[in-house]
């Protein structure tokens, strides 16, 4: 049986000053994390979805968490950005 690698993550809510902390499987994509956080009731489902920001870098929704885990970090601080961005 293969053990699933996990990384502790602390998500900050886009509007409220609240946090959600959990050990996340490193093969989970940010889209899957978004769906999970909606299921947990931490964020609300909304048109346009959310962006996840780690160390001032916007994470790709299709990318797994493992693409962004720095070596030796105990807990990743991930901001959730919920504002609609319009490109002109």
Predicted regions and their residues:
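Ubiquitin system architectures
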Residues: 1-88
């Amino acid at each position: 049986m293969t053990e699933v690698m996990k990384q502790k993550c602390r998500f900050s809510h886009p509007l409220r000053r609240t946090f959600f902390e959990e050990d996340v499987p490193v093969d989970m994509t940010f889209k899957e994390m978004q769906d999970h956080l909606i299921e947990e009731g931490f964020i609300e489902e909304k048109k346009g979805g959310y962006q996840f920001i780690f160390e001032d870098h916007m994470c790709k929704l299709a990318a797994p968490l493992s693409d962004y885990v720095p070596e030796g970090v105990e807990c990743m601080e991930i901001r959730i950005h919920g504002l609609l961005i319009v490109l002109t």
